[in-house]
């Protein structure tokens, strides 16, 4: 047992990456993979069973808990943004260096791509059987919507852009409130569950129009995977070339969320007073001369 533990320790030391930004990128990749794997897995189960194994609520619950699990996995290493819109907001507020925006975005998109690939492999036979050995993007037998978001038939481009803008702005406002130490800070360890609850609320209130991507990586990574896996370039042209909306609109919504929170809440908060308990501890450590 002692030798095994020593071997595990040595292997850990050998595999340890000393470049901090690379460690953080790997964490973002894995966290986003978990988000997409569980989230899109729930969509696959509903679509491929034609609604007999879940529905709109189960999809939203799965995405909410998937975000929670992704944050729990990656949070200690990278902060678990799992979303370029969140990273953009943090860089815009100077809470993270701008170099993290392209690095995190690439890692998050890769994680989403891999998560989609896992679900494709998991439901491979069911996907092919669903539409008689065809990979169809949209319609009654469409399966591309398992992985990326597409607009409902009633939705035009302007309304869809506004949909993603408001959804992302709402997400950013809530995330900033959750992580703001001068506001009502969430008890340590519960941040992941609270952010997951925010995603659940957004999904159940704003998910009808286009599936509330509010995350460029979560949408583009799986969309790119479907284009490569056999659905083809139609995944980029369907919905009047909808693909760019879940990328551009969330980034603009992120800026709006930052401005709304800072102008209406953040700029008016005062730092909390020093803790009396901490002062007592410090005073108790003072040595008095007798």
Swiss-Prot record:
InterPro entries: Aquaporin-like, Aquaporin_3, MIP, MIP/Aquaporin, MIP_CS. Residues 79-92, 211-224 dip into the membrane without crossing it. The record marks 63, 212, 218 as: Selectivity filter. GO terms for biological process: glycerol transmembrane transport; polyol transmembrane transport; water transport. One of its GO terms (molecular function) is water channel activity. Residues 1-24, 75-78, 93-100, 178-189, 265-290 are cytoplasmic. It catalyses: glycerol(in) = glycerol(out); H2O(in) = H2O(out); urea(in) = urea(out); H2O2(out) = H2O2(in). GO terms for cellular component: basolateral plasma membrane; plasma membrane. It is found in: Cell membrane; Basolateral cell membrane. It is a multi-pass membrane protein. The chain crosses the membrane at residues 25-42, 57-74, 101-121, 160-177, 190-206, 243-264. Pfam families: MIP (PF00230). Belongs to the MIP/aquaporin (TC 1.A.8) family. PANTHER family: AQUAPORIN OR AQUAGLYCEROPORIN RELATED (PTHR43829), AQUAPORIN-3 (PTHR43829:SF7). Aquaglyceroporins form homotetrameric transmembrane channels, with each monomer independently mediating glycerol and water transport across the plasma membrane along their osmotic gradient. Could also be permeable to urea. Also participates in cell permeability to H2O2 and H2O2-mediated signaling. In skin, transports glycerol to the epidermis and stratum corneum, where it maintains hydration, elasticity, and supports lipid biosynthesis for barrier repair. In kidney, contributes to the reabsorption of water, helping the body maintain proper fluid balance. This is Aquaporin-3. The lineage of its organism: Eukaryota, Metazoa, Chordata, Craniata, Vertebrata.
């Amino acid at each position: 047992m002692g030798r095994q533990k020593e071997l595990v320790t040595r292997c850990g030391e050998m595999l340890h990456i000393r470049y901090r930004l690379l460690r953080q990128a790997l964490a973002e990749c894995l966290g986003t993979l978990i988000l997409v794997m569980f989230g899109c897995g729930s969509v696959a189960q509903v679509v491929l069973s034609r609604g007999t194994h879940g529905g709109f609520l189960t999809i939203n619950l799965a995405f909410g808990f998937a975000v929670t699990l992704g944050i729990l996995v990656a949070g200690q290493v990278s902060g678990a943004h799992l979303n370029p819109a969140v990273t953009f907001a943090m860089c815009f507020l100077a809470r993270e260096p701008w170099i993290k925006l392209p690095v995190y975005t690439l890692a998050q998109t890769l994680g989403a791509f891999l998560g989609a690939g896992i679900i494709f492999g998991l439901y491979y036979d069911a996907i092919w059987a669903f539409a008689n050995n065809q990979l169809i993007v949209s319609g009654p037998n469409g399966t591309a919507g398992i992985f990326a978001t597409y607009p409902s038939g009633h939705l035009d481009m302007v309304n869809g852009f506004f949909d993603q803008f408001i959804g992302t702005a709402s997400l950013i406002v809530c995330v900033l409130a959750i992580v703001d130490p001068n506001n009502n800070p969430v008890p340590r360890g519960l941040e992941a569950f609270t952010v997951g609850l925010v995603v659940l609320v957004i999904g159940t209130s704003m998910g009808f129009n286009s599936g509330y991507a509010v995350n460029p990586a979560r949408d583009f990574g799986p969309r790119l995977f479907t284009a490569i896996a056999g659905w083809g370039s139609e995944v980029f042209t369907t919905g009047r070339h909808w693909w760019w909306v879940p990328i551009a609109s969330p980034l603009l919504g992120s800026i709006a969320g930052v401005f709304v929170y800072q102008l209406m809440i953040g700029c008016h908060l005062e730092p909390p007073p020093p803790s009396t308990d901490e002062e007592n501890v410090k005073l108790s450590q003072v040595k008095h001369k007798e």
